[in-house]
UniProtKB/Swiss-Prot annotation:
Biased composition range(s): Acidic residues: 199-208
Protein name listed in UniProt: Protein yae1
Biological role stated in the UniProt entry: The complex LTO1:YAE1 may function as a target specific adapter that probably recruits apo-RPLI1 to the cytosolic iron-sulfur protein assembly (CIA) complex machinery. May be required for biogenesis of the large ribosomal subunit and initiation of translation.
Short name of one Pfam family: Yae1_N
Subcellular location: Cytoplasm; Nucleus
Taxonomic lineage from the root: Eukaryota, Fungi, Dikarya, Ascomycota, Pezizomycotina
The keyword Cell cycle is annotated on this UniProt entry: no
Keywords: Cytoplasm, Nucleus
Biased composition, class Pro residues, residue ranges: 21-32
């Protein structure tokens, strides 16, 4: 049977489109995939985050270092100050004793004045010589106990805490001067004098008088 309507209803296989739809092309530089301000904002956020991270980390580690190192430095500083204080006190003592010596001209049997002679002149010269010796010692202590000198060239074992290194090196420098100045002896005398000032009994007062009358220890 002849079907004359095939052309109308399209019973034949469908024909492919003559002009297929082209796939979307890559965006041109004039039409970017993201707004132009996003790269700038990204850089700003990265920079701000970097700075905030540095500030937070620095504050945390600086505080931890301070907490660990301050007690060590304070203890060493007090010990060094004791050494320097003892030397300064001895120097002032020699200065006051030297200035109190008054030279008077000796007189002959006829009453005439002769050249200046004083039985204490030799003692005064000895004190001046001793004062010069202690002054040299004091100046050397100032150099050796300076912060830069005490901790110069600090090197410790790998993995050792910095405060441990500081304490060990500082103790070597300070303890040497403590022995030279006889800090332990001076501290015993000071404790006896403080006990006397506080009026802690007659025995303490007598001990303080004895220690006060005792000669100053020889500084090496």
């Amino acid at each position: 049977m002849d079907n004359s309507l095939d052309d109308i209803f399209g019973s034949s296989p469908p024909h492919e489109t003559a002009h297929p739809i082209a796939p979307p092309s890559n965006p041109s530089p004039s039409n970017p995939a993201e707004p132009s301000e996003l790269p700038s904002l990204r850089r700003q956020h990265v920079t701000a985050g970097y700075r905030d991270g540095i500030s937070a980390s620095k504050g945390e580690h600086v505080q931890a270092g301070f907490d660990a190192g301050f007690p060590v430095g304070a203890q060493l500083g007090m010990r060094a100050g004791t050494v320097l204080g003892i030397l300064e006190g001895v120097l002032r003592g020699y200065e006051s004793r030297t200035s109190s010596v008054v030279k008077k001209p000796a007189r002959t049997a006829a009453g005439g004045a002769t050249k200046s002679e004083n039985p204490n002149e030799a003692d005064a010269e000895a004190r001046n010589a001793k004062r010069a010796e202690i002054l040299t010692l004091y100046q050397q202590a100032l150099k050796d106990l300076d912060v830069q000198a005490v901790f110069a060239g600090l090197q410790g074992a790998e993995g050792e805490k910095p405060e441990t290194q500081l304490g060990r090196k500082g103790d070597v420098a300070v303890s040497g001067w403590e022995k030279r100045v006889l800090v332990a002896h001076w501290e015993e005398n000071m404790e006896a004098l403080e006990a006397k000032d506080d009026g802690e009994g007659e025995g303490a007062a007598e001990e303080g008088e004895a220690s006060k009358a005792a000669p100053a220890p020889a500084l090496s």
